[in-house]
Amino acid sequence: MTQLDALKQFTTVVADTGDFRQLAQFKPQDATTNPSLILKAVQKADYAPLMRDTVGRFKGRALDEVMDRLLVRFGCEILSIIPGRVSTEVDARLSFDTSATVTRGERLIELYQAEGIHIDRVLIKVAATWEGIEAARELEQRGIHTNLTLLFSFCQAVACGQARVQLISPFVGRIYDWYKKSAGSGWNEAANADANDPGVKSVREIYNHYKHFGIATEVMGASFRNIGQITALAGCDLLTISPELLAQLAASDAPLARALDADSAAALDLPAKSFDETGFRYALNEDAMATEKLAEGIRAFAADAVKLEQLLLAA
């Protein structure tokens, strides 16, 4: 049995890509996209006709609408291949605007529904700022399921659980990147690998908290740098994995055991936690890593959204 097949026994495997032509070989249940992945895909010759067709069909419409329609076109193509859900992201430039995020999330769902896609097959991705979490709360109350992304801290996870969002995406690799860069020459790779990886430890803490307190929000580890990070989180509700790392898992037959377990988490002695807006902002501010990576992630996704718009204008 390959490691990929073994992982699927414990965890829902999700493909993290906009390149839907790669999906079939790995047979993922779900798929995730973001502006950076879509930008990467549309620059490939295979996807140029899809972008030109979208621009041609909706010429004269507002640029933000054309971009949303392109994201939905990719999402529909992905959903024709996978049995589960696709995550489509709201423009990161709205990360601090609750009302605008709700409006864009509703429009994305309307565009999917116009293509015959059931609402339960789409997760609206929103950055896990306070404003984003409040937008997700509103969307969930309207029956629209959400995926809270750019999640780097325990306080973000707790607030998402309080908002009863469908799913969160804690970023393993970017947490690892920050701690490795911060340590500089003092970084010990072996001592910070696998279960001791700072990104893995963050997801494990969140998973244990959710399972211990019966929080229904799904935990989907994301942003992996190596196979060790993935295998150390076997048993997590979902893991979203790049095609490159999926290929490595599919090529390996090394043993893989469950690392996270809901029953074990339920038996832990953990303190209850909750955050109001003031407490959330203070806790996030106290976490230098999370503050820096959240801001950096929003800037990067926003910049790629601008690049995507420029490609649409030039198409």
From Swiss-Prot:
Gene3D superfamilies: Aldolase class I (3.20.20.70). One of its GO terms (biological process) is carbohydrate metabolic process. It is an enzyme of class 2 (transferase). Pathway: Carbohydrate degradation; pentose phosphate pathway; D-glyceraldehyde 3-phosphate and beta-D-fructose 6-phosphate from D-ribose 5-phosphate and D-xylulose 5-phosphate (non-oxidative stage): step 2/3. Keywords: Cytoplasm, Pentose shunt, Schiff base, Transferase. It is found in: Cytoplasm. GO terms for molecular function: transaldolase activity. CDD domains: Transaldolase_TalAB (cd00957). Its EC number is 2.2.1.2. It catalyses: D-sedoheptulose 7-phosphate + D-glyceraldehyde 3-phosphate = D-erythrose 4-phosphate + beta-D-fructose 6-phosphate. It comes from the Bacteria. It holds the Pfam family TAL_FSA. One of its GO terms (cellular component) is cytoplasm. Its main location: cytoplasm. Homodimer. PANTHER family: TRANSALDOLASE (PTHR10683:SF18). This is Transaldolase. The lineage of its organism: Bacteria, Pseudomonadati, Pseudomonadota, Betaproteobacteria, Burkholderiales.
